[in-house]
UniProtKB/Swiss-Prot annotation:
Its main location: membrane. Glycans are attached at residue 351. It comes from Rattus norvegicus. The keyword Phosphoprotein applies. Detected in kidney (at protein level). Detected in kidney. The modification Phosphothreonine is found at residue 678. Keywords: ANK repeat, Calcium, Calcium channel, Calcium transport, Calmodulin-binding, Cell membrane, Glycoprotein, Ion channel, Ion transport, Membrane, Metal-binding, Phosphoprotein, Repeat, Transmembrane, Transmembrane helix, Transport. The chain crosses the membrane at residues 321-341, 379-401, 413-435, 442-462, 486-506, 550-570. It holds the Pfam family Ank_2. Homotetramer and probably heterotetramer with TRPV6. Interacts with TRPV6. Interacts with S100A10 and probably with the ANAX2-S100A10 heterotetramer. The interaction with S100A10 is required for the trafficking to the plasma membrane. Interacts with calmodulin. Interacts with BSPRY, which results in its inactivation. PANTHER family: TRANSIENT RECEPTOR POTENTIAL CATION CHANNEL SUBFAMILY V MEMBER 5, TRANSIENT RECEPTOR POTENTIAL ION CHANNEL PROTEIN. This is Transient receptor potential cation channel subfamily V member 5. It comes from the Eukaryota. Residues 591-595 are annotated as: Interaction with S100A10.
Length: 723
């Protein structure tokens, strides 16, 4: 019985995995069965084909059951709505009014009503007819097809109102609200219609629909619809940050923006920092953004006023405190290292019993370890080390439960492996203390490990510097990405060739060929060969087996030439990918560090940033003032663009005239000059690099996307353009 139960659990897990793999096939089968059931049923077929004659005949047929359903549990009204057959749907509602409130019974469309389908198809007339005949504007479609998952291509929520908002039909939205649809309704994930709009791929109409729904948010509610959180505690604003929806984020920020004054190209604005400022919030917006799995979320850090707020906090409080913390940790590690170097040792009392035993010192027992003045000085350092380890654990452990172990240890921007390293180090220090108090031998093992891990943690403080911060992420990605994959390949190669070398030399004299005398030694020698630490560990003064030469030749080609160079290429690719986004990663590191320090530091050492609205009659909210500089005359830039067009056109014409000086080609040149009057945006390679680069700068500036660091590259040297 004890053996059978685990086998049943394993079988259930395998069946679940197979069902997940065959999800698409399962859905395909359901839709095929649906078409089959529609074809076999005269009522469903007539609803699909809008066959009014058949429906009238079935209407007078007493044996016809209008409650019959298809393979998915759908009624004839569902089928008519699915195929946009308004006449058939109206006849069915007149014949069987109860069909209006009927929903689909089978997965994956459980709970779907004809109203949901009509809204999806944006059939306004059918929606109006359904609502007029009593269709519920609050019906919920709870099937798996309406969940937010990788299996589904769309996520429209569960309520008809969210369906209408997601398809972008303002008329249907107004109809539903007039018929009692609750705009504050939440689905099984706790998402309101505003949350669902944030998740839509079409950002433009989502913003328009967002405003429309907010205009209907009235009543005596204590909290605005925008501040209603979902099951994860995310408001629509925070969800936009987590998803990296910069369009929706900017749209919401414009609603919080108040222009104070405008003077020529300068504009002074104040931004409401509600939900943005992480000061005093358990679920920080900034922390949610930097810990998001989506790369687009990091673009939020470049938006106003987030960029200005982070810069203010980092320069005023974050950077000084972080540098001070880094120096304290270095002094702490120096103290720990000194205590380890001068640990209590004495000369060994017992005689050596083996010729290979080279130990001359041993650890002192607890009674002899703290006797002299030097021992008492070391005791002070050891107490500092132990207290520091306890403080580290008290700081780290609450964050593990607050954030979650997987995100806390797995996200490189939040610190990732450094948290594992520092917690392991602190645990080893406490283990050393226990071993010292109990006079247990072998403390050299945790001491050596703690020294390595403790000094490696110093790299964590490099994130305070723009030049060094991204390199720590680069090292992490190489270790946990490239190196792990390479180690799997290396293990297979070493295992295979070590076995081959051992078999080849198994019949030889081990005194002459000690490198492959036994299997463990053969494994280690092959590992050294793989890393080119040693060269061909064989005794060439004796006859070697013929297979050794062939095997060693194959090993040298595969290991040294192929795999090591492959590993170098993999690390080079990782370096290139991280280098492309190094500035973005460093900003994310700065935000994560700022939020961490703000959460840990006492409030009197880290006051709240911004302007309190209470002092100026703006309520209990905080604001940040930002000054913008805008080009006062955009037509001046357009003139620069036209100047570059004409100069580039003349340059191309000169080059073509040099290549085609003969009179027979004049017509071709003339025709070419006509084409050159409207040069394409992608300039020809014959143009000079300075002119081409200048054109790109002006074109991007005109379109409002000027970003020299990202679009035109960095590190190419400073170039000055004279207009």
């Amino acid at each position: 019985m004890g053996v059978k139960k685990p086998w049943i659990q394993l079988q259930k897990r395998l069946n679940w995995w197979v069902r997940e793999q065959d999800w698409n096939q399962h859905v395909d089968q359901l839709h095929m069965l649906q078409q089959k059931s529609i074809w076999e049923s005269p009522l469903l077929r007539a609803a699909k084909e809008n066959d009014m004659c058949t429906l009238k005949r079935l209407q007078h047929d007493q044996n016809c059951d209008f409650r019959q359903r298809g393979a998915l549990g759908e009624t004839a009204l569902h089928v008519a709505a699915l195929y946009d057959n308004l006449d058939a749907a109206i006849m069915l509602m007149e014949t069987a009014p109860y069909l209006v409130t009927e929903s689909t019974l089978c997965e994956p469309f459980v709970g779907q009503t004809a109203l949901h389908i009509a809204i999806m198809n944006q059939n306004v007339n059918l929606v109006r007819a359904l609502l007029a005949r009593g269709a519920s504007a609050s019906a919920r479609a709870t099937g798996s097809a309406f969940h937010r998952s990788s299996h589904n291509l769309i996520y429209y929520g569960e309520h008809p109102l969210s369906f209408a908002a997601c398809v972008g039909s303002e008329e249907i939205v107004r109809l539903l609200i007039e018929h009692g649809a609750d705009i504050r309704a939440q689905d099984s994930l706790g998402n309101t219609v505003l949350h669902i709009l944030v998740l839509q791929p079409n950002k433009t109409f989502a913003c328009q629909m967002y405003n429309l729904l907010l205009s209907h948010d009235g009543g005596d509610h204590l909290k605005s619809l925008e501040l209603v959180p979902n099951n994860q505690g995310l408001t629509p604003f925070k969800l936009a940050g987590v998803e990296g929806n910069t369009v929706m984020f900017q749209h919401l920020m414009q609603k919080r923006k108040h222009i104070q004054w405008s003077l020529g190209p300068l504009t002074s604005s104040i931004y409401d920092l509600t939900e943005i400022d992480s000061w005093g919030e358990d679920l920080s917006f900034l922390e949610l953004v930097v810990s998001s799995k989506k790369k687009e979320a990091r673009q939020i850090l470049e938006q106003t006023p987030v960029k200005e707020l982070v810069s203010l906090k980092w320069k005023k409080y974050g950077q000084p405190y972080f540098c001070l913390l880094g120096m304290l940790y270095i002094f702490y590690m120096i103290c720990f290292t000194t205590c380890c170097v001068y640990r209590p040792l004495k000369f060994r009392d017992a005689n050596r019993t083996h010729v290979r035993d080279n130990t001359v010192l041993e650890q002192k027992p607890l009674q002899e370890a703290y006797v002299t003045y030097q021992d008492k000085v070391r005791l002070v350092g050891e107490l500092v080390t132990v207290i520091g380890a306890v403080v580290i654990l008290l700081i780290e452990i609450p964050d593990i439960f607050r954030v979650g172990a997987s995100r806390y240890f797995g996200h490189t921007v939040l610190g990732g492996p450094f948290h594992v390293i520092i917690i392991t180090y602190a645990s080893l220090v406490l283990l050393i203390m226990v071993m010292r108090l109990t006079s247990m031998n072998g403390e050299v093992v945790p001491i050596s490990m703690a020294l390595v891990l403790g000094w490696c943690s110093v790299m964590y403080f490099s994130r305070g510097f723009q030049m060094l911060g991204p390199f720590t992420i680069m090292i992490q990605k190489m270790i946990f990405g490239d190196l792990l994959r390479f180690c799997w390949l290396m293990a297979m190669v070493i295992l295979g060739f070590a076995s081959a070398f051992y078999i080849i030399f198994q019949t030889e004299d081990p005194e002459s060929l000690g490198e492959f005398s036994d299997y463990p030694t053969a494994m280690f020698s092959t590992f050294e060969l793989f890393l080119t630490i040693i060269d061909g560990p064989a005794n060439y003064s004796v006859d070697l087996p013929f297979m050794y030469h062939l095997t060693y030749f194959a090993f040298a080609i595969i290991a040294t030439l192929l795999m090591l160079n492959l590993f170098i290429a993999m690390m080079g690719d990782t370096h290139w990918r991280v280098a492309q986004e190094r500035d973005e990663l460093w900003r994310a590191q700065v935000v994560a560090t700022t939020v961490m320090l703000e959460r840990k530091m006492p409030r009197f050492l880290w006051p709240r940033s911004g302007i309190c609205g209470c002092e100026y009659g703006l309520g209990d909210r905080w604001f940040l003032r930002v000054e913008h500089h805008q080009e006062q005359n955009p037509y001046r830039v357009l003139r620069y663009v036209e100047a570059f067009k004409s100069s580039d056109k003349e340059e191309v014409q000169e080059q073509l005239s040099e290549k085609q000086p003969s009179g027979t080609e004049t017509g071709t040149l003339a025709r070419g000059s006509v084409v050159l009057q409207t040069p394409p945006l992608s300039r020809t390679t014959s143009l000079s690099s300075n002119s081409h680069r200048g054109w790109e700068i002006l074109r991007r500036n005109t379109l409002g996307h000027l970003n020299l660091g990202q679009d035109l590259g960095e590190g190419d040297g400073e170039e000055i353009y004279h207009f």
